[in-house]
Amino acid sequence: MALYFIGLGLYDEKDITLKGLEIARKCDYVFAEFYTSLMAGTNLERIEKLIGKEIRVLSREDVELNFERIVLPLAKDHDVAFLTAGDPLVATTHAELRLRAKKFGVESYVIHAPSIYSAIAITGLHIYKFGKSATISYPEKNWFPTSYYDVIKENLERGLHTLLFLDIKAEKGKYMTANEGMKLLLKVEDMKKEGVFTQETLVVVLARAGSLNPVIRAGYVRDMIREDFGSPPHVLIVPGRLHIVEAEYLVEIAGAPREIIR
């Protein structure tokens, strides 16, 4: 009897690994959460049909506050699957859930799947040159987060690329676009005036990673902010110092201005 954290991958129900599918099918109970990420190419019904099980979707409150009451007691006497988009432990929330399972006396296993951290390699930027990542969050009343701006600054000082996740309000069906992310960054630039993110900043947008036809675009903010990248999910990348191969890839594959090749 155990709890299995199973990754569903990035885009549609076919992204789950064979191992993940096999284990999910043998589990007695299957739970899932979709508030930490969006799988744009599928829906709950299609995932249930593939697995052959009814899936109970948990809210953020269920996961963060009631996991010990809803999920862990079942895993004491049954095999239980907990499905998440992407790779299970990329979201720090899920690592904390595994700790809770251990304290509850429940054995747990992790079945990996495609993650945005590997998928960003399709941009041509070298994975080992990425620094700390950050999330651009929607401002709220009396709260305008700016920490992501500081992360970009720190990474640029070291010549490193910055992967920026874009906020998700799944319960409201609200998914931030790369355009919205750029606008928020420009607002922070107006506030801080440190020259970290301007109209002349080179950015890379990756939309619908994991699909057969993802959008990969690179260019200056002044141009990119007006582009239509299609439906979410999007991620935004601010490159650091570019290797010649990275620059050529961005030009030839992502449509960046040729002048970035130096």
From Swiss-Prot:
EC annotation from Swiss-Prot or TrEMBL: 2.1.1.98
GO terms for biological process, alphabetical: methylation; protein histidyl modification to diphthamide
Gene Ontology MF terms: diphthine synthase activity
Keyword Cytoplasm in annotation: no
Pathway: Protein modification; peptidyl-diphthamide biosynthesis
Keywords, ordered alphabetically: Methyltransferase, S-adenosyl-L-methionine, Transferase
Binding site for S-adenosyl-L-methionine: L10, D87, V90, S115, I116, L166, A209, H234
Reactions catalysed, as given in the entry: 2-[(3S)-amino-3-carboxypropyl]-L-histidyl-[translation elongation factor 2] + 3 S-adenosyl-L-methionine = diphthine-[translation elongation factor 2] + 3 S-adenosyl-L-homocysteine + 3 H(+)
Transmembrane segments: none
Pfam families: TP_methylase
Top-tier EC class: transferase
Protein family (similarity comment): Belongs to the diphthine synthase family.
Quaternary structure annotation from Swiss-Prot or TrEMBL: Homodimer.
Summary of the function given for this chain in its UniProt record: S-adenosyl-L-methionine-dependent methyltransferase that catalyzes the trimethylation of the amino group of the modified target histidine residue in translation elongation factor 2 (EF-2), to form an intermediate called diphthine. The three successive methylation reactions represent the second step of diphthamide biosynthesis.
Protein name (Swiss-Prot/TrEMBL): Diphthine synthase
Record organism: Pyrococcus abyssi (strain GE5 / Orsay)
